[in-house]
Amino acid sequence: MDFISRAIALFWIVILSPFFLLIVICSLLIQGRPILFKQKRVGKDFQLFNIFKFRTLSIKNNNNLFIRPNIIKISKWGRFLRNTKLDETPQLFNILFGNMRFIGPRPEIPEYVVNEKFDFLKELKPGLSGYSSIIFRNELEIMSLLKNKDPYDDILKIKIALDKYYQFNKSFIVDLKLVAITLLSLFMPRITGHY
């Protein structure tokens, strides 16, 4: 499966390369450098790796995705990239490098990872999509409704439960279903409740 994931990632990198170039040019013209956002995340067996995204935040906020949504500054271009999930497409390279899979738990920053709660990482590689990615597709909007000191902490508890559910129910068929739901949420969001 790992070889197949890498091969599919390479295929899509080649197919999408013109779009990558277009996004890079638009990002340079609209936001300037840096084009990519890079951050340490925790992978399988608690190994750290750099996750890649197209930058959507202001330079001031660029190193911290988990501050309160009302003080995050996202440009109109950045919001477009987020809403269409185009900001996530550089993670195809993470899959190609073997850090991630297409389906699995979303990789967290080290500060949020407590080993005993994330024991599924002994078995699973992080994924580009999965149960928590689909349910929390509009994560910033959900966080803005939570009034406690660390709104992401509430979301993280649910994500961990979803990741453990995936751990005990994973199969090739489940992965195919999650890929299909992910594509539906991108191209027909009203069907999956994402607006």
Predicted segment positions?
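A short, structured surface patch at a secondary-structure boundary
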Residues: N70-Y131, V179
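Short, hydrophobic secondary-structure boundary micro-motifs
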Residues: I23, K38, F66, I103-P105, ...
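Short, glycine-rich, amphipathic interfacial segments at transmembrane boundaries or analogous
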Residues: F37-K73, S132-I158
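C-terminal terminal-structure detector
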Residues: K125-Y195
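Short beta-strand segments
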Residues: I23-V24, K38-K40, K53, F93-F97, ...
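A hydrophobic, helix-centered structural microdomain
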Residues: M1-I59, N169-Y195
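Positions in alpha-helical segments
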Residues: A9, F37, S75-R79, L162
